[in-house]
């Protein structure tokens, strides 16, 4: 006979599988196949796209964790679905694995924010148009900045050295104060600005020393996200990241970049004032 592999467990997302829906899908697939075709259930793709396991996420509340399924958990889901799919339909609903799974989907997730809902409901067509227009902004920027036709600059993010990573780790472990950490980052920014000025770049950047992974850093300044401890996934090559999980309505609870954006020009002004003296 022939084998048909059915990718019934999503290998790319991190969410728990709904057994009721998946068992209905498996039943439909089997009914559509000839008798000489054996259906083998599988994940929809390799599990390299998802974190390894939920076992070590001890800082994530169980009320959140029950909704997730990483690589190991997806394999457990496959095993349980395989057993349930072989049982008669009237027997499935009495199985503990099925009962426990369906409990998760019976309650609505608490993930909504009334203010976000209201703002979305009141969006108007003109809100999608940025003013002034791009052509006007270009003219204003050219007049104000006085840059050459092809200005020299760098990519915004400078290397995160082992010293910077060590300082950030010490701050997260409460081994140094927020003030000590802030002053350290300010010095890195000031040195970065000074170096760019010395080599004659036209457009300076502040180096982005204040952040770790960009997505994680910005996510921490927003509501509506959850954060994991060990849920690493591959970004590219040997680089791995822990992306925040979009849990509910996302909104900005505080300024994200204002403090550093304000400090960088100040450090440049101090540098130029010192050179003038």
Indicate where each model-derived feature is located.
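Domain-level signal for soluble alpha/beta catalytic cores
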Residues: 1-275
């Amino acid at each position: 006979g022939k084998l048909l592999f059915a990718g019934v467990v999503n290998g790319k997302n991190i969410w728990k599988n709904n057994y009721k829906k998946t068992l209905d899908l498996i039943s439909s697939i089997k009914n559509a196949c000839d008798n000489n075709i054996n259906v083998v259930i599988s994940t929809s793709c390799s599990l390299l796209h998802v974190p390894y396991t939920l076992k070590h996420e001890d800082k994530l509340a169980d009320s959140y964790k029950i909704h997730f399924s990483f690589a190991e958990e997806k394999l457990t889901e496959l095993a349980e679905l395989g057993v349930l799919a072989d049982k008669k339909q009237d027997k499935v609903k009495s199985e503990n694995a099925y009962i426990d799974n369906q409990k998760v989907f019976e309650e609505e997730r608490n993930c909504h924010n009334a203010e976000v809902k209201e703002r979305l409901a009141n969006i108007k067509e003109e809100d999608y148009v940025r003013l002034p227009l791009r052509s006007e902004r270009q003219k204003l920027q050219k007049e104000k900045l006085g840059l050459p036709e092809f200005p020299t600059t760098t990519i915004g993010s400078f290397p995160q050295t082992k010293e910077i990573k060590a300082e950030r780790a010490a701050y997260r472990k409460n081994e140094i104060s927020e003030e000590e950490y802030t002053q350290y980052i300010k010095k890195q920014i000031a040195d970065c600005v000074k170096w760019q000025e010395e080599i004659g770049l036209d457009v300076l950047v502040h180096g982005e020393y204040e952040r770790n992974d960009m997505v994680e850093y910005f996510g921490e300044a927003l509501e509506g996200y959850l954060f994991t401890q060990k849920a690493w996934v591959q970004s590219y090559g040997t680089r791995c990241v822990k992306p925040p999980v979009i849990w509910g309505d996302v909104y900005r609870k505080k300024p994200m970049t204002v403090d550093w954006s304000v400090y960088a020009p100040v450090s440049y002004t101090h540098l130029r004032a010192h050179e003038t003296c």
